[in-house]
């Protein structure tokens, strides 16, 4: 559940609080509006392959999912290797959650990101903070892929993120 506005008798969903009351804001509350909210599940397909990803993590969701997809597609990492790889997250834009804080040029990196890469971020003007490895706040990507093997048989593979309690099960 979410907060209750007793004077109006309205129960706000946890994601409903991501809307804005300012009439000029693109994510304003309005009749028929389609508010932007942070959940961002992904289904990707190519030929006989299909791939699904999802992640809890508020403002980090899209960043975490994109990093996992990038690792799989560009480095050939397995799904499990990709979800376990160190992450970074930017907090430069206003948070989706009230009171919508932002931190100019703030980037958090997990401990597994090497110091040389952190120095490169600092050289570009970022303020870099280091999270421990497998930081809860870095999101928790769960993923499963269905693809044919060399014999044309369907094979399911999964990745379960150790940052939170997660399992990869398929049938």
Task: Name each model-derived stretch.
Residues 115-171:
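In a subset of proteins, long, contiguous C-terminal domains/tails are tracked
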Residues 1-134:
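Proteins synthesized as precursors that undergo proteolytic processing into mature forms
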